[in-house]
């Protein structure tokens, strides 16, 4: 019985040791998440200071409009008109 208790305690210690040294968020998508955070945001997607808005249709600049703490990239009127009339 004493041997079983010692083996159980040893197993718990090894599991705890391996858990401490495990890499947090060590999945394949981690690089994609970091790259997406650095990139630009499309129209009607959330934006902030490090993540600016992408250029729109025909190179029109999009603005990051904030309402409280909710910031979204908005299309400009020129961009919407150019897309509607095919320019």
Curated annotation (Swiss-Prot):
The keyword Lipoprotein does not apply. Belongs to the neurotoxin 02 (plectoxin) family. 01 (Tx3) subfamily. One of its GO terms (molecular function) is toxin activity. It comes from Phoneutria nigriventer. This is U9-ctenitoxin-Pn1a. One of its GO terms (cellular component) is extracellular region. Disulfide bonds join 40-54, 47-64, 53-73, 66-71. Residues 23-37, 75-87 form a propeptide. Expressed by the venom gland. Residues 1-22 form the signal peptide.
């Amino acid at each position: 019985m004493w041997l079983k208790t010692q083996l159980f305690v040893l197993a718990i210690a090894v599991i705890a040791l391996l858990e401490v040294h495990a890499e947090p968020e060590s999945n394949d998508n981690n690089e994609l998440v970091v790259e997406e955070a650095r990139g630009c945001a499309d129209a009607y997607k959330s934006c902030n200071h490090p993540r600016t808005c992408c250029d729109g249709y025909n190179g029109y600049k999009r603005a990051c409009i904030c309402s409280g703490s909710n910031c979204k990239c908005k299309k400009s009127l020129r961009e919407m008109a150019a897309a509607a009339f095919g320019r």
